[in-house]
């Protein structure tokens, strides 16, 4: 994959990645819901939330930064940064190959928040659903090191 950096933009085959901040307006809410319906893997939910629940979530804007990702004029996904220096990336089907370019763009444009021992990593970490074997393989192939696997705990299970 040939990538280059040009004036703060990361490129793939000379197509610039551009980021657009997500705000709680109708077209953003609708686009995010359509993207949510296309996801094969999720961390925060098992069943698709109702549109109303989704809308309320967007209005709360719970992230440090939340952006759509565009290649030329086409939206290829979105990502968020949380205050614990974690990153969530959601690329639309057919755009997984853009992950390394997007991560490079994120690392170029953002600085991690300062480390807090036992609470916040010194650098960014990427959330990957345990069932997303393709994303895990992609991260491993690019030399990234897995840190942990997180389990849910239910009273009935313990």
Where are the regions that the model predicts?
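Conserved beta-hairpin
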Residues: 65-77
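Conserved acetyl-CoA-binding loop-helix of GNAT-fold acetyltransferases
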Residues: 95-114, 133-137, 141
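A short helix-loop-beta-strand connector motif used in the catalytic cores of GNAT acetyltransferases and
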Residues: 56-68
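Conserved acetyl-CoA binding element of GNAT-fold acetyltransferases
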Residues: 82-100, 127
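Conserved N-terminal entry element of GNAT/NAT acetyltransferase domains
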Residues: 1-26, 158
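Conserved catalytic-core motifs of GNAT/GCN5-like acyltransferases
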Residues: 145-158
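Conserved beta-strand-loop-alpha-helix junction that forms the acyl-donor binding cleft
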Residues: 117-136, 153-154
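Conserved GNAT-fold acetyl-CoA-binding loop/helix
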Residues: 40-55
């Amino acid at each position: 994959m040939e990538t280059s950096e040009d004036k703060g933009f990361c490129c793939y085959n000379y197509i610039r990645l551009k980021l657009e901040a997500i705000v709680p307006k109708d077209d953003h809410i609708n686009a995010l819901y359509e993207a949510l319906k296309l996801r094969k893997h999720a961390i925060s939910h098992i069943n698709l939330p109702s549109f109303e629940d989704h809308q309320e979530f967007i209005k709360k804007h719970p992230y440090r930064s939340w952006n759509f990702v565009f290649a030329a004029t086409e939206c290829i996904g979105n990502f968020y940064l949380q205050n614990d220096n974690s990153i969530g990336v959601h690329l639309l089907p057919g755009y997984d190959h853009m992950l390394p370019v997007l991560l490079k763009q994120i690392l170029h444009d953002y600085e991690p928040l300062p480390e807090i021992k036992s609470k916040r990593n010194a650098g960014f970490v990427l959330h990957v659903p345990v069932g997303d074997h393709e994303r895990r393989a992609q991260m491993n192939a690019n030399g990234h090191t897995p840190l942990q696997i997180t389990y849910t705990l239910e009273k009935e299970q313990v």
